[in-house]
């Protein structure tokens, strides 16, 4: 790990851009060490901007962790997306203080709005070819920012969606 860290360089931006490749090196090491058999499944929980195999948009442009995983494991790599319709989310403010903020209401043309029309509070749905188009979806990172919704082709990025209609920071 120290060798990989040294290869990432000393500059903050360099290290930030290379973090997904370092995530992959660490994940591959652990998978090869503990889950090499094909019948063993591995679950890796990560941010949607990292786990998808397409792009880190709208964050800092870099090759996402998911692209390295897809190249190494092919279609066996199945990234899943977690979305929340409404409620509170924990993130940091500009001074790195932890804050619970209310999520903005999903716009009518967003995936969260569409999924909120379903009666269940928590459910999973696969992303079929019917979703092969640009649609707005929430991207919440480590910091609260005013813009929460961005256009994505979720079908190309994820195999399915776990949706939570409403939550606060302590209850689902």
What are these regions (language model features)?
Residues 1-40:
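A charged, amphipathic alpha-helical module
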Residues 39-41, 75-76:
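Residues that mark the start of a beta-strand
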Residues 47:
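Catalytic core of tubulin tyrosine ligase-like
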Residues 52-172:
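C-terminal regions of proteins
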